[in-house]
Amino acid sequence: MPVRKVSQRIPFTPSKTQAALLEQCFGARRFAYNQQVETFNSYDKDANPRPKYPGVTDMKVANEWLRDSPIPSSALSNTIMDFRKAQAAYFRQAEYGKNRPRFASKSDNIQSFRNTVPMRHMDGNRYPLSRKLGSVRIRRRDRIRYPLESLSSWTVKRENGVYYLVLLFNVDIQPKTKASGEVGIDLGVKDFLTLSTGEKVNYPDRLHQLEEKVRWEQRKLSRRVKGSSNYRKQKAAVAKAYAKVSHFRENFQHQLSHKLIEDNQFIGMEMLAVQNMTRKAKKKLDANGKPVRNGQARKRVMNRSILRNGWNSFAEKLAYKAQWYGRTFVQVDRFYPSSRLCHDCGYKYAGLRLSEREWVCEGCGVLHDRDVNAALNILGEALRLSQAGE
């Protein structure tokens, strides 16, 4: 039976002594990570072509306080692994100068450390972290949903001033009954997605309210003196508002993707290059060297809408859930002209503009809703690709 990784996040309130120990662990994790970043930054093609990165033992020998730290040794090893992942991500994007590993800071909103050698038992209603760190009380409403025998790691995290215990399990996937539906999905800016059934789905209004709250908190932050106590408090309020937006969007996408997987055996969706679609509009200059209006403002608005919708994360959720539950998920090439083709007769309307939400086919005279027609074409092309690949 296939296995998947699932996590459960449990909020808890540590005692003053335990909170102090956890803060020491966060500090030890930051120190270990920053040692790797410092070594990475010391690279020099001539003077230091192969810098030696310190291991856990090296850091403990050189720093006596680290030997006495309550942080588990596996957490320090995981910190080094986290740095290597960040380093690999940087090298993948090196040509763009992005994702360079940066120093971890005590002022970062999220502090965490991960232990991959967990205890797999409970002491009553408490889960033991380690001998030095003590245990965490699990409230009845947060009871652990999966067997502890399948626990692979735990992470203690402090986010927006709240402590969380995040448990990661390897659990068997329960097979779902075969569904009969087939659906094509067209992603959009005006509507989050349009289905080939004609249904259009948008984020709930609550998301707009949360985004307004972010803007409100940011305006308050702009009026604070940088570095002051009020500035730090307001910065935490901004981070909390952002986290609410992120969690709401993630929850909505999980519920929607689960419903689509539950109802359909075959799902077709277009493949979009979000990074290319959200590039800045190039500036144009007139004869005097002054910038001319070329739709940059409209492009910025569209970029924000595209990034806000989170198309890539939604596609990833559909892909792995389809794999879990035996569904077929096919993505159509981004250059496929799904909006321009008539679903009924195949006529191609080459002059279709972005502002045209409906158009009449010159081949058969049918009135098309732009997005519904695109979703139908995506479903047809995905079925064709699936049959060709068999």
Predicted regions and their residues:
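Acidic carboxylate diad motif detector
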Residues: 53-159, 298, 304, 308
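Positively charged, helix-rich recognition surfaces that bind polyanionic ligands
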Residues: 6, 16, 20, 31, ...
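Generic detection of short hydrophobic beta-strand segments and adjacent strand-loop junctions
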Residues: 8-12, 136-142, 146, 201-203
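Gly/serine-rich nucleotide phosphate-binding loop at the start of the catalytic core
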Residues: 1-77
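Stable alpha-helical structural segments in soluble proteins, enriched in small hydrophobic residues
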Residues: 36, 79-90, 372-382
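Long, hydrophobic, amphipathic alpha-helical segments used as structural scaffolds
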Residues: 37, 41-44, 87, 91-98, ...
